[in-house]
Amino acid sequence: MSNRLFAPGCALILYKPELAIKLHSILNKNLGEMEMLMTCCHHDPKLKQATLIINICPGCDKRFRSDYENSSTISLWEILAESDFFAFPDYQSQSMTIIDACPTRDQERIHLAIRKLLLKMNINLIEPKSTGINSTCCGDSFYGIISTEKVKDQMIRKASELPLNDVVVYCISCSKAMFVGGKQPHYLIDLLFAEETVSKTFEPDDWHNELSTYMDKH
């Protein structure tokens, strides 16, 4: 059996580190002890043996799966979707729509697991026109390629395409994009713990500066 690590991702550590710690504790209690991987997915973790990385961030899933030796991935969503140990909150059929993240656009296993989690939480999911493997970018992936104002225009355009104000996101950068676009994002980790998704830093320049500073050190 391969070694296991839990990778909360840089964005969650910046957003709500206490939830990363809480999740780590839940996984340790129910799956056995594992360390928390704090190496950013943009850097080689230099794993010495075959290691399964339990990840949250879509970018982490893509890079740890594809770019480094001795590394394979499974999303936290897949684990929780099949679990019998997590106490899911009940949202009483509240209707929400969703954005599927760019880095895992081709990973139907993740799309299916997330929708199973939403069902377990009694969320009535209204799929947008472009969803799953056919989803389109929230706008954040264009940062650094086009001007910040054009990035924000993309975010506003994406938000306007969604059928509801309440939007499930599982990428923190997607949540920032939805705040720019005037929607109310519901980050999946927040939903699992019945917490409100708050904006904190969401202007693209501010968010990417904060993220880059953290990533450079990890």
Protein language model regions, located:
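Iron-sulfur cluster-binding electron-transfer modules in prokaryotic oxidoreductases
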Residues: 1-218
